[in-house]
């Protein structure tokens, strides 16, 4: 029975890539810099303290993959762990360092074109675009129109939004158009309808995602995003390994978290909603228990990126990694004879780095299975090696990019 479980620790980079200079990210290292801060006692909080402790990830080869990427061991990680998995560090072939590019490349389809971006920090959006969106939505104005941190923009504009009913439009260094609205005063359904309008009006702009950012709370300092985020992505430019599994093998692909949104539902047969790392982990365990032949269970743990990476919260990121590590044996215990587990990431988001954007880094590729030979798989030239390996494993037609590493 062929089953594969892909767990994406969103933004968990393990060292800058050779092309990081083009992105302003030379020296970035999400794992290494978190470990450095922990070792120096600078990442203590109510949940954790001291050196970074990731014994189970280290057994799967995380510390070794990081060393092969950066030339050094991350302090606190076990350099002498008994390695039980195959490990690698992978560079990105895609032109960007964004979520869709990383995920699509993982599934065998790198993004070789350039996304459209709203590069102006202020007055970011063309007036003709926002005029069309407002007219179709029956709105008389909007707030924002800038690059912004997703939590700071709520403090800056949330109360005015509640008072006026005007949605908050903002963007970032990624190819995104984000809309924040209060779930209670504006309405979640209304926000999602507005995002669909924006998605349609952005057809000629080559923007990767429209993101609905619902929030709640009575006022500044008390606003909080809810778990009802939606990502409206464009479709991948060609068939991913997910689509090939479904179409060629009548297989199942179970999306947990925002996976379905990222792939614009292409190649997704089942969607499980869960919010927060504990609930995402529980949902993953449940779906592994239920999974049959020719099934991929695919989970994105978005909080590493959204709650800790972008927020530059080193202690929070470290605590979340340690929580994930403690629960990892629960997945390993469910593995059957022919199963494959792949732990990876889609880009970096170094919480010690200037700004609030992603970082261009190698991703870890940690592979475990009872029939997988442990040891180094070296440097992979593209995330698409994961997709090609899955295509070979499930016996689908091969992908155009990537090399099988098993």
UniProtKB/Swiss-Prot annotation:
Cofactor note: Binds 2 manganese ions.
InterPro entries: Alkaline_phosphatase_core_sf, DeoB, Metalloenzyme, Phosphopentomutase_DeoB_cap_sf
Enzymatic reactions: 2-deoxy-alpha-D-ribose 1-phosphate = 2-deoxy-D-ribose 5-phosphate; alpha-D-ribose 1-phosphate = D-ribose 5-phosphate
UniProt: Mn(2+) 2 binding residues: 305, 310, 358
GO MF terms held by the record: magnesium ion binding; manganese ion binding; phosphopentomutase activity
Alphabetical UniProt keywords: Cytoplasm, Isomerase, Manganese, Metal-binding
GO cellular component term, pick one: cytosol
Positions with a binding annotation for Mn(2+) 1: 10, 346-347
Family matches, as SUPFAM superfamilies: Alkaline phosphatase-like (SSF53649), DeoB insert domain-like (SSF143856)
Biological-process GO terms, alphabetical: 2-deoxyribose 1-phosphate catabolic process; 5-phosphoribose 1-diphosphate biosynthetic process; metabolic compound salvage; nucleotide metabolic process
CDD domains: PPM (cd16009)
Cofactor: Mn(2+)
EC number: 5.4.2.7
Pathway: Carbohydrate degradation; 2-deoxy-D-ribose 1-phosphate degradation; D-glyceraldehyde 3-phosphate and acetaldehyde from 2-deoxy-alpha-D-ribose 1-phosphate: step 1/2
Top EC class of this enzyme: isomerase
Localization in the cell: Cytoplasm
Family: Belongs to the phosphopentomutase family.
Matching HAMAP family: Phosphopentomut (MF_00740)
Role noted for this protein: Isomerase that catalyzes the conversion of deoxy-ribose 1-phosphate (dRib-1-P) and ribose 1-phosphate (Rib-1-P) to deoxy-ribose 5-phosphate (dRib-5-P) and ribose 5-phosphate (Rib-5-P), respectively.
Protein name: Phosphopentomutase
